[in-house]
Amino acid sequence: MFESFETIRLVVRRMTMGDAQELTAISDVAQVSQWMSFMEGGFPLEKARAMIAAQNETRETFFAVRLRNRALAGALGMVDHPDHSIEIGYWFGLDHQGKGYGYEAVRAYLEQIATDPSLAGRPIIAEAYPDNVASIKLLAKAGFSATSRPGHRPNRIGFALAPRNSVEPKSI
């Protein structure tokens, strides 16, 4: 699996303990944490450290999304489900929302998945709360469509990416 990748404005790499404090700073805000089930009740430093530490023991992987000036803008996540599907997720700090970073990161992430021999060709899914309009718009722009099934977590809409052969990698 890939460790890092870059876009025009972003540097994305596997999350480490060195990211925990900054991750808490951008995530432990109600307007961000309300959309993430694992951040229920907030996202203090202990939760950030536990999430980062667990990624080697679970089928979950997290990536730090940094601007070229090295500021942490957000995070990407991947869950390798037993049914062979890959679930992606993302969140960005308030100061970095609405600037196109989310789409840029997700699009490049999907391109990395499509070219990784261990991941390519597998179904890619995502989910969002019905009232998370920004996330739903981002997923649609990235090529996802709502499915008739709910997400893996309660009260979520399930989304699926168009089949691989209909998604052409493109530069961001």
What does each model-found stretch correspond to?
Residues 1-34, 62-172:
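Acyl-donor (CoA/ACP) binding surface of acyl/acetyltransferases
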Residues 31-52:
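Conserved GNAT-fold acetyl-CoA-binding loop/helix
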